[in-house]
């Protein structure tokens, strides 16, 4: 996340170090013509390299909670044991911003927004993060990065004929980061990531119903004061109420909920 969860140039409004900062897109558009990136030449390694560089850019341009911050301490406690999960090497940080979101990238980077942490219990956060890990494991994040690379209209930055992506300028990284966060997963991809998140909770003996309660919280937000923002974020997702019901049905079948 998008996913958690969407063509503009610059990405972030940075209000240095405050919890009132907002992670947002401005309304400028990329003027260059879109150039094709053939799937055959855009590898997993390309996606991971671009993702790492884009996330590094976002980390520099957002208020990241330091190691001694209560948000970081809490996330370490919740998720620290899962940095190596299902063959993936994961890293995580907290952005101290007012938007409610979390996302994962093709290099295994997971970023959680402090406003999401404020509204979720520990196990609900694990459900959200498990969902995001699902997008990485299912290669959804690779496909999103390839699409972002195309939308950012800088495919001529590709290096050799082997398809290895060369170093990018700061403005190019900002454009790719922006396009990456605007990427939307299909409903099928979201449902499959939900299944992965459920199984992540089940495998580690967490309360699987935390995923249902997380969806219900998002559903309540989408009908409240933040309706327009939440509706935009969730527009490509299956209905949150339906997602909660699907979790309940699985839990009943597995004997984990009555």
PLM regions and their residue ranges:
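Bacterial N-terminal signal peptides
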Residues: 8-16
């Amino acid at each position: 996340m998008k996913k958690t969860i969407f063509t503009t140039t610059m990405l972030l409004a940075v209000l240095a170090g405050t919890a009132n900062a907002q992670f947002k897109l401005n309304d400028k558009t990329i003027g260059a013509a879109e150039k094709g990136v053939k799937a055959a030449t855009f590898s997993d390694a390309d996606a991971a390299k671009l993702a790492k560089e884009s996330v590094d850019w976002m980390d520099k341009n957002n208020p990241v909670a330091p190691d001694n911050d209560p948000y970081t301490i809490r996330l370490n406690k919740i998720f620290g044991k899962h940095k190596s999960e299902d063959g993936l090497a994961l890293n995580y940080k907290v952005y101290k911003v007012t938007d409610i979101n979390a996302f994962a990238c093709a290099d295994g980077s997971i970023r959680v927004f402090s406003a999401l942490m404020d509204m979720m219990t520990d196990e609900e956060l694990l459900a959200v993060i498990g969902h995001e890990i699902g997008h990485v494991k299912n290669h959804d994040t690779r496909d999103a990065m390839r699409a972002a690379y195309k939308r950012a209209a800088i495919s001529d930055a590709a290096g050799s004929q082997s398809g290895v992506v060369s170093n990018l300028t700061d403005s190019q990284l900002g454009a790719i980061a922006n396009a990456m966060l605007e990427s939307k997963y299909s409903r099928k991809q979201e449902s499959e990531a939900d299944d992965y998140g459920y199984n992540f909770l089940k495998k580690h003996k967490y309360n699987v119903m935390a995923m249902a309660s997380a969806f219900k919280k998002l559903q309540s937000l989408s009908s409240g004061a933040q309706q327009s923002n939440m509706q935009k974020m969730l527009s490509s997702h299956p209905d949150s109420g339906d997602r909660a019901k699907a979790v309940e049905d699985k839990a009943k079948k597995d004997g984990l909920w009555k």
